[in-house]
């Protein structure tokens, strides 16, 4: 048994997982059997899981800063006030 919905499929293909999850919730209300509702709930849970944001790490530009500083030093362009002094992690 498979449930098909053009709109939900389109939203999933575009990466709009939150909207697709809402669409699957709308479809669950319209279905008549428990087996179909279970499949729609699984698809909705899949979309909700995909919509969660990944834990992104903050960018750390200290490596770039050090590389630029070394290049400037080689070229004789050393200026201590080029970069702001942020705390290193």
Curated annotation (Swiss-Prot):
Pfam families: PerC
Classification via InterPro entries: Tscrpt_act_PerC/SfV_Orf40 (IPR024684)
One Gene Ontology MF term: DNA binding
Superkingdom, natural source: Bacteria
Keywords for this protein: Activator, DNA-binding, Plasmid, Transcription, Transcription regulation
Keyword DNA-binding on entry: yes
Function: Transcriptional activator of eaeA/bfpA expression in enteropathogenic E.coli.
Protein name: Protein PerC
Organism annotation: Escherichia coli O127:H6 (strain E2348/69 / EPEC)
Organism phylogeny: Bacteria, Pseudomonadati, Pseudomonadota, Gammaproteobacteria, Enterobacterales
Primary gene name: perC
């Amino acid at each position: 048994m498979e449930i098909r919905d053009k709109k939900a499929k389109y939203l999933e293909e575009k990466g709009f997982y939150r909207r697709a999850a809402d669409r699957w919730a709308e479809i669950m209300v319209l279905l008549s059997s428990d087996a179909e509702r279970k499949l729609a709930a699984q698809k909705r849970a899949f979309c909700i899981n995909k919509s969660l944001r990944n834990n992104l790490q903050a960018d750390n530009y200290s490596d770039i800063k050090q590389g630029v500083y070394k290049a400037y030093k080689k070229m004789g362009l050393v200026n201590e006030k080029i970069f702001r002094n942020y705390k290193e992690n």
